[in-house]
């Protein structure tokens, strides 16, 4: 497991390669292969926009991998709407102790994910389907953590995510500056759905120029929810 030592502020001169080596450690070579894959196959297959290539390390690989700060050793993780594998694949590379399942409905994306996982020996399961489908819940449900990135508004995301985790499991939604606004707007609906202990946390503080903003919620028994 990697550890980030907060230094109270942004580094004066950010070195993305040094940051990547700190986060991915001995598995940096796999992370580099993923970077190259996204920059080539990912663009060609329409999984990543060409304008994103210059900032793949900062905005994508590292932005996702640092969420591992919120996940305990050996936990099971379901990544909903995984797309090109974000955040699931960076997490799997940085944290081989985790048991990760990538859920993706589109064929071209799920094929890409399966190819990368197999060719790089990652202990990751790829499930093609939508998170809300009963077959997906049966195959991937009961997880400790469910992750997502830029998938949907919080209320809809909770409807898809909460059934995939056990009681007291956690939903980790990577969000941007709108996180507080989304919580304020959807809090009542989230409570009815069984999402408790809502808060906003930052990951990668002192490591990334812009920390990753995560909305965190715990699945709580609905009978304890108050109207």
Curated annotation (Swiss-Prot):
Major location (coarse): cytoplasm
A Gene Ontology term for the protein's cellular component: cytosol
PANTHER family: S-ADENOSYL-L-METHIONINE-DEPENDENT METHYLTRANSFERASES SUPERFAMILY PROTEIN
Binding-site positions, S-adenosyl-L-methionine: 81, 86, 131-132, 149
Enzyme Commission number(s): 2.1.1.-
Family the UniProt entry places it in: Belongs to the methyltransferase superfamily. RNA methyltransferase RsmG family.
Pfam families, per database record: GidB
Name by which UniProt lists this protein: Ribosomal RNA small subunit methyltransferase G
Gene3D superfamilies: Vaccinia Virus protein VP39 (3.40.50.150)
Location within or outside the cell: Cytoplasm
Gene Ontology molecular function: any one: rRNA (guanine-N7-)-methyltransferase activity
